[in-house]
A protein has these predicted regions:
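Short beta-strand/loop motif that positions the catalytic acidic residue
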Residues: 81, 86-89, 93
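Hydrophobic/aromatic beta-strand patches that form the interior of the parallel beta-sheet core
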Residues: 38-40, 86-88, 118
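Residue-level signal for short, function-critical loop segments
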Residues: 14, 43, 91-93, 121
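Mobile cap/lid helix-loop segments that gate and shape the active-site cleft of serine hydrolases
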Residues: 42-77, 83
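C-terminal catalytic histidine-bearing segment of alpha/beta-hydrolase fold enzymes
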Residues: 102-153
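Hydrophobic anchor at the start of a short beta-strand
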Residues: 8, 85, 115
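Primarily recognizes the serine-hydrolase "nucleophile elbow" in alpha/beta-hydrolase
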Residues: 1-51, 69-70
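Conserved alpha/beta-hydrolase "acid-adjacent" motif
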Residues: 94-103
Length: 153
């Protein structure tokens, strides 16, 4: 497969996007830091105004402390060493609000972390690799271009 173990990224969608962005922002050593992150309609924040309630409750309980909310609101954990990101979402996603991705993207830019974001007008949530997603070809082509040319390793 020609995989270079020194150049490994992480990909996650929805709650898996929270897991991926948590690894990208909470790593404890250079060896555990991914080199890039690919996030599809990710849960990012634990802020009650924008989070996915089920993900929040499963991760940090129904009545979490302010410290726990901040710790797992990954847009607040971005720093200059956070790995570069490819983010894709739909503006009509009602399950995981677009603010999750948008605020994370803005945090990446604030810390000069290379990032690209693709927002599709329709698709809702959970489109992944579904053939009936109108923008499937577009987002997979954009991801391939980014992986081949945009990722700085």
């Amino acid at each position: 497969w020609n995989i270079n173990p020194a150049k490994v990224g992480i990909m996650g969608a929805s709650a898996g996007g929270h897991l991926a962005s948590t690894l990208a922002t909470h790593y404890t050593s250079k060896e555990t830091r991914p080199d890039f992150q690919i996030l599809l309609y990710p849960v990012i924040t634990m802020d009650a105004n924008f989070t996915h309630a089920g993900s929040r409750e499963n991760l940090i309980t129904k009545n979490p402390s302010a410290d726990l909310i901040a710790k797992y609101s990954n847009e607040l954990q971005v720093n200059a060493q956070t790995p570069q990101a490819f983010i894709a979402l739909s503006s009509d996603d009602k399950a995981v609000l677009p603010q999750n991705s948008i605020n994370y993207y803005l945090a990446l830019l604030k810390h000069n972390v290379p990032a690209t974001m693709h927002i599709y007008p329709t698709g809702g949530h959970g489109w992944g690799f579904r053939d009936n997603f109108t923008y499937k070809r577009q987002w997979t082509d954009e991801l391939e271009k980014w992986l081949r040319n945009g990722v700085k390793l």
